[in-house]
Amino acid sequence: CSFICTDPKGSLICETGKMLQQNGYRIKVLNTINFKKSMRYNPFSYIHSVKDILKLVTCLMQNTRGDGKGGDPFWEKAEQLLYTALIGYIWLEAPEEERNFNTLVEMINSMEVREDDENFENSVDLIFKDLRAKNPNHFAVRQYAKFKLSAGKTAKSILVSCGARLAVFDIPELREVTAYDELELDTLGDKKTALFLIMSDTDDSFNFLISMCYTQLFNLLCEKADDVYGGRLPVHVRCLIDEYANIGQIPKLEKLVATIRSREISACLILQAQSQLKALYKDNADTIIGNMDSWLFLGGSEPTTLKELSAALGKETIDIANSSENRGKEVSHGLSYQKLGKDLASVDELAVLDGGKCILQLRGVR
């Protein structure tokens, strides 16, 4: 099978890379700690339809930060409209070598707004004006027209938020890494491949790239399984997602985990505590956990995790013998037996689990 491994600190590839290569595996690396040691990853290379544009924008919004407008959803929705319009134009109209985040950032940087002149047209306005003249129903034109409903001061605030969200792309190394693609994510189900996603466990500045990679990976492989291979990939793809809470949010994961297994894709989410998953996915966390066939507990002290695991393990029946002795004029003795239910592993017992032991819970097995 193929492996996709989250590799905090980059130690896994050093320990296993050579062995995998000797056993016929292709090795792919996305290194967000040291971009000079990374292969190129261009999310735009995996856009095949308008739906993919919307998925990419959703992932970008959920895993990056704007300028923090107090939680007002208006600003995020306005940003989303602009990203959708610009990415739609880049994908549908720009030359192949310009289909990347670098072009997106340059277009936003060139969008000058003048508050005192509502009729001023910047270079991007002129691009969309020409495109509208050729094709009024163009997807990108329709999205851009909605963005242009905002007034000058509002538009400037939206652009500032966009600039803050995409500020990381001003780093030359990141611009180079995302300029074109070498990962070939859509081929991981075709032949044995090991993809190592190296990320920092102390700095999450570039973790949105890892989340974006997983999001596109799941969608690409599911589509390829259905469209090319009749529902099942020829090579099983196993995702070992360590430090899952630090990666960010994969949109619609609660639906993906319920459907990927039938397409020869499996996912192993590794967390420090169950509460981390709930912080990311809120009510959908229970759905994600419910779709997992196995649960491996290596120890921990987080109360919610311990309580839910204790309840999931259930109870065992124990026999209790009670003896009594009464001393009066005459001495009498009594002995009674009863059966009681006891937690198979109490919260206290789980909290002090031996470091050399673990608890594995399998679906359908007690």
Regions from the PLM with identified roles:
Residues 257-362:
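Conserved ATP-driven motor cores of ASCE-family P-loop NTPases powering translocation/secretion/packaging/pilus
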Residues 1-265, 280, 339-340, 348-366:
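P-loop NTPase motor domains
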